[in-house]
């Protein structure tokens, strides 16, 4: 199948690692990274499955499926096998479920990579979803949800999700709870294990997976191992986010809302959210990066310098927070002082006026110059960045494979 060699990939000048990109017969795309100097090995697998695919009647199912894949498969049926193996091999494993993807990853001592890949591949070939462990893990989901209820960022994001269009997948409760994953299905005459099998078989497929593997072995050895273990992952030829109708804008036209949130912990913030079309297809131009650079500027004449001078705010950040294949959310977050809270309307006017001045009244050549400077700095940062440690390298390479190489770029 298709492959890209180390020589055809762009990488930092100081990066001595060797890379290879291959596609297996089952259409699973893989980045192989060989680093003879590493003491740790790592792997990460991303699949185009996320919370937006949760059935309305079983919200949190994608997240629950992520949990269950760790709890045994036909080849390694013990519930704690993989986590235990990573732990005794000086490593760890974890996973997370987002709106439009789920990512599984691990790191451990380099000499155990071969056996770890054997175990890891079982997640995606033959999970068991045993009834006893399903019941046990429901309690883990409930505990996680109870913990999240006390976390202000999660509370704020759930509020934001609730403002989406009625019926849009963004509105769904991605974490799930005992009520949504047990009580409601039982009341409807079904059980969660049936939903798990149906979801896994209808949403997981090798052709929508991307795998990154980093080890001390040479590229040929890593490729042999990956083919040995991951060629058995079923290819159901699914579309990314199977069964979800495309909708570029989850919010109604003219979406304008203002909410006052009572936090759990003491904090004073003013946050603005601006929904935009997904920026994934614009990975080369990164249009929101220019906006982030200008608004987040901290020098004389900036929004932050004015807020500090007035004693209204101490920190300001601007950038793309939430991203998905449907939309992006550009966020401006200001840490307010106690004196600044009553002046939030003036601060809002200041921000909108600042943006209007920069992007409507500034000469075009000024913005072009700023853009050119940003491009030059990012290129220098890429070329001369220091070597990334193993777990971050594997996750970063996985993200690069998912977002960039999939679009025919040659930069890792």
Locate the predicted segments by residue:
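Polar, glycine-rich mid-to-C-terminal structural blocks
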Residues: 266-286
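Acidic/histidine-enriched segments that form metal/cofactor-coordinating
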Residues: 2-9, 44-47, 64, 68, ...
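Non-catalytic, conformational "gating/processing" segments within enzyme and secreted inhibitor domains
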Residues: 153, 193-229
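N- or domain-start disorder-to-order transition segments that initiate the globular core
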Residues: 1-40
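Short, conserved charged micro-motifs
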Residues: 113-116, 219-224, 282-283, 339-346
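Short pre-active-site segment immediately N-terminal to the catalytic Zn-binding motif
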Residues: 49-59
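Short acidic-hydrophobic surface loop/beta-edge motif
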Residues: 20-25, 256-263
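Short, hydrophobic beta-strand segments
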Residues: 270-273, 328-338
